[in-house]
Curated annotation (Swiss-Prot):
Cofactor(s) recorded in Swiss-Prot or TrEMBL: heme b
Binding annotation for a ubiquinone: 201
TM ranges: 33-53, 77-98, 113-133, 178-198, 226-246, 288-308, 320-340, 347-367
Subunit structure: The cytochrome bc1 complex contains 11 subunits: 3 respiratory subunits (MT-CYB, CYC1 and UQCRFS1), 2 core proteins (UQCRC1 and UQCRC2) and 6 low-molecular weight proteins (UQCRH/QCR6, UQCRB/QCR7, UQCRQ/QCR8, UQCR10/QCR9, UQCR11/QCR10 and a cleavage product of UQCRFS1). This cytochrome bc1 complex then forms a dimer.
Record bears the keyword Iron: yes
Membrane topology: Multi-pass membrane protein
GO biological process, one term: mitochondrial electron transport, ubiquinol to cytochrome c
Protein name (record): Cytochrome b
Function: Component of the ubiquinol-cytochrome c reductase complex (complex III or cytochrome b-c1 complex) that is part of the mitochondrial respiratory chain. The b-c1 complex mediates electron transfer from ubiquinol to cytochrome c. Contributes to the generation of a proton gradient across the mitochondrial membrane that is then used for ATP synthesis.
Domain of life: Eukaryota
Length: 379
């Protein structure tokens, strides 16, 4: 008799996705981040749901409702810090996942890659509106500064900003709608994740060599399920260590001051995972130019498959491309550091050089070096 998991309409879907899925035998731990992102998403939705039960999206009570969660709700402090640090873990996994895709040429699965870029944008939007909810100083001023960027759009900019605000400044209407967005977006993300997996399972996984591995596949379960469990345990270990020992390590002290429209913080900056884009935004003296550079710094990912000039898919056997890849990582870390610094000498010029290098590496140097590698291999 055929096993029920292969015949039942619902279990068949799960079976084909997580149990009998043919998987390359040589995929490394860099392939763990997809499942870790799924774990992060589930954690964020669950902790977020419990936080939403006690939170009030109103300017007069939002800050005190978060304080109430931390002080009076059973393990409320734990749920709140799990949610805040869970967002950081989410972005660490997200950036590692994208980095893996860039290094091993996974972007050649174009539909999967494009849905992935869309997912990145949606997660970024969710994190941004979520940061506004505690209604601390950095929440308020972060929302004001970032939404104000839309006023750089010619002709309709100001109207657009006021439409998003629901008034003439960030106020009650803004907080209420941001809470609504923050609640609905994770479910949209979940739907996109399913589409992302659907497209991935059309082609099958890539592997470190970038060479088709149809002749060497193993079932996903038990091999990769156990490998994923190890990754999950490490993720949980890091998240719990962060949450229980240094819950405020990645946060901003300014957010422990209630929002005050009459007092601007000395240094307005977003959470660490947006700092690289914030540095690129600040490095251009023109407002519209800065906004375009900010958008392009993320949307450039869409153009990566078109910039593939190498005859090889993966960077595994391309030392020059590897050098440029790690230069790009170092550049992004530099931009992240610059984004956290005040706008003064020497940070301004370092930020501008790092921003130029970021676009230069992706648009010019990497495609050129790939062509040189082809020539060296006489391809």
């Amino acid at each position: 008799m055929t096993n029920i998991r292969k015949t039942h309409p619902l279990m068949k879907i799960l079976n084909d996705a997580f149990i009998d899925l043919p998987t390359p035998s040589n995929i490394s731990s860099w392939w763990n981040f997809g499942s870790l992102l799924g774990l992060c998403l589930i954690t964020q939705i669950l902790t977020g749901l419990f936080l939403a039960m006690h939170y009030t999206p109103d300017t007069s009570t939002a800050f005190s409702s978060v304080a109430h969660i931390c002080r009076d709700v059973n393990y409320g402090w734990f749920i709140r810090y799990l949610h805040a640090n869970g967002a950081s873990m989410f972005f660490i996994c997200l950036y590692a996942h994208i980095g893996r895709g860039l290094y091993y040429g996974s972007y050649m699965f174009q539909e999967t890659w494009n849905i992935g870029v869309l997912l990145l944008l949606t997660v970024m939007a969710t994190a941004f509106v979520g940061y506004v909810l505690p209604w601390g100083q950095m929440s308020f001023w972060g929302a004001t500064v970032i939404t104000n960027l839309l006023s750089a759009i010619p002709y309709i900019g100001t109207t657009l900003v006021e439409w998003i605000w629901g008034g003439f400044s960030v106020d009650k209407a803004t907080l209420t709608r941001f809470f609504a967005f923050h609640f609905i977006l994770p479910f949209i993300i979940t739907a996109l994740v399913i589409v992302h997996l659907l497209f991935l399972h059309e082609t099958g996984s890539n592997n470190p060599t970038g060479i088709p591995s149809n002749m060497d596949m193993i079932p996903f379960h038990p091999y990769h399920t156990f490998k994923d469990i190890l990754g999950a345990l490490l993720l949980i270990l890091v998240l719990l260590t962060l949450t229980l020992f240094t819950p405020d390590l990645l946060g901003d002290p300014d957010n422990y001051t209630p929002a005050n429209p009459l007092s601007t913080p000395a240094h307005i900056k977003p959470e660490w995972y947006f700092l690289f884009a914030y540095a690129i935004l600040r490095s251009i003296p023109n407002k519209l130019g800065g906004v375009l550079a900010l958008l392009l710094s993320i949307l450039i990912l869409i153009f990566i498959p078109m910039l593939q000039t190498s005859k090889q898919r993966s960077m595994m056997f391309r030392p020059f491309s590897q050098l440029l890849f790690w230069t790009l990582i170092a550049d992004l870390l530099t931009l992240t550091w610059i984004g956290s610094q005040p706008v003064e000498h020497p940070y301004i010029i370092v930020g501008q050089l790092a921003s130029i290098l970021y676009f230069l590496l992706i648009l010019v140097l990497m495609p050129t070096v790939s062509l040189i590698e082809n020539k060296l291999l006489k391809w």
